[in-house]
UniProtKB/Swiss-Prot annotation:
Residues 1-23 form the signal peptide. Gene3D superfamilies: Mannose-Binding Protein A, subunit A (3.10.100.10). This is Snaclec jerdonibitin subunit alpha. Heterodimer of subunits alpha and beta; disulfide-linked. InterPro entries: C-type_lectin-like, C-type_lectin-like/link_sf, C-type_lectin_CS, CTDL_fold, Snaclec. It comes from Protobothrops jerdonii (Jerdon's pitviper). Disulfide bonds join 25-36, 53-150, 125-142. Expressed by the venom gland. Negative results: does not induce platelet aggregation in either platelet rich plasma or washed platelets under high-dose conditions. Does not inhibit platelet aggregation induced by high-dose thrombin. Does not react with polyclonal anti-GPVI and anti-GPIIb antibodies.
Length: 156
């Protein structure tokens, strides 16, 4: 009887510790609010990283960052997973040229409601840099190869 209680208590502790921290996300993905996130340490161009994300899980795209709190979560997750001192990580932000005007948008189609740009954009794709502790957005050429992070809406 004592062993049953011990095992039951252990399972309860595991269940409670997992709830809200990735329990509803696939293995190796992390949870924040209603989304799942994963850092990939493969070098890819922006376009190849975006395609790779979409092949991992239905609805996955390069990460979009929609608030300061989400930016802090993303920076923390990247810092935990990437130890190299000079790393760049693709995010889903890109610039579209429409004639004389440029507009930025997330690869998942959402509008840019939160910005943390270092300087105005002259190139078309964006990364987070380790040197800024993954807090600032830098624009770089889309054909460069970098690490990347994917995000998708967690199933209910």
């Amino acid at each position: 009887m004592g062993r049953f209680i011990f095992v039951s208590f252990g399972l309860l502790v595991v269940f409670l510790s997992l709830s809200g921290t990735g329990a509803d996300c696939p293995f190796d993905w992390s949870s924040f609010r209603q989304y799942c996130y994963r850092v990939f340490k493969q070098l890819k161009t922006w376009e190849d990283a975006e395609r790779f994300c979409s092949e991992q899980v239905k609805g996955a795209r390069l990460v979009s960052i929609e608030s300061y709190r989400e930016a802090v979560f993303v920076a923390q997750l990247l810092s935990e997973n990437i130890k190299a001192t000079k790393s760049h990580v693709w995010i889903g932000l890109s610039v579209e040229n429409k004639g004389q005007q440029c507009s930025s948008k997330w690869s998942d189609g959402s509008s840019v409601s939160y910005e943390n740009l270092v300087k105005p954009f002259s190139k078309k794709c964006f990364v987070l840099k380790k040197e800024s502790e993954f807090h600032k957005w830098f624009n770089v050429y889309c054909g460069q190869q970098h690490l990347f992070m994917c995000k998708f809406l967690r199933p209910r």
